[in-house]
Amino acid sequence: MATVDIEKVLETCLLAGKIMLESDAEMYRVEDTMSRIALASGDYRLVSYVTQTGLFVGLDGTSTIRMVQILNRSINLEKVSNINQLSREYVMGDYTLDELLTKLKELEQERKFFPLWLRFISAAVVSGTIMILFGGVWSDLFLTCLIGGLGYILYYSSLKVLRIKFLSEFLAAFFIGCAALLSSQLGLGINQDMIIIGCVMPLVPGVQMTNALRDLLAGHYLSGVSRGTEAMMTASMIGFAIAFVFQLFY
């Protein structure tokens, strides 16, 4: 295979890994996807080093190494699924390397996010159902849905302005705590504890915790510890905010 083809193989693998990392995919999945693409491109063995903030790839037997920095990360499981599907189709011979690279570039440019109103409804449904599951009363359902939805919208909106994830989580949890306690004191809510528990659930880093454990079990200790630390920081910000609210009200 010519040098230009080797460069294109590396570019394709690097782009696939970059999109997956930015979409918060597990490290083992990123490495496996890139390895399969390289293997299907000419029986190459890919050598990679993957972290949450950087990606290094090379082909065994060559001197070329490529790297990319990961600056922005968000949960986008749809992109992860799309890249998995594209890699499977490429391995089966449905696409050429050029076609796969083109489709990956198109996927990278996609900015498909759920509209704000749908995010509000989703957060509201999660908040309300969790509140009921944890033993809350049905009369608090509407209030929990409303506060939970508004709290998540505050988190999402403040993140765009502040660009600091942990501060946005603190502000959202602080709003949830204040709204729940005020509603309870005004007689609008009955069980303030269950309302708060339900409302903060959309902020809880469940995906990060799961991926951290999966990376640790797969032997990716660096990424597993860093993901776990990030999840613990998020949980701490939520806890600090609620504790601060209780300190203010009582």
Positions of predicted regions on the chain:
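Generic secondary-structure signature for well-ordered alpha-helical cores
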Residues: 18, 22, 39-43, 88, ...
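Core alpha-helical transmembrane segments of integral membrane proteins
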Residues: 112-186
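Alpha-helical transmembrane segments and their cytosolic membrane-interface
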Residues: 72-127, 131-140, 227-238, 250
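C-terminal ends of transmembrane helices
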Residues: 103-107, 151-162, 210-222
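Generic detector of multi-pass transmembrane helix bundles and their immediately adjacent loops
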Residues: 185-250
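Soluble N-terminal domains of membrane-associated systems
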Residues: 1-95
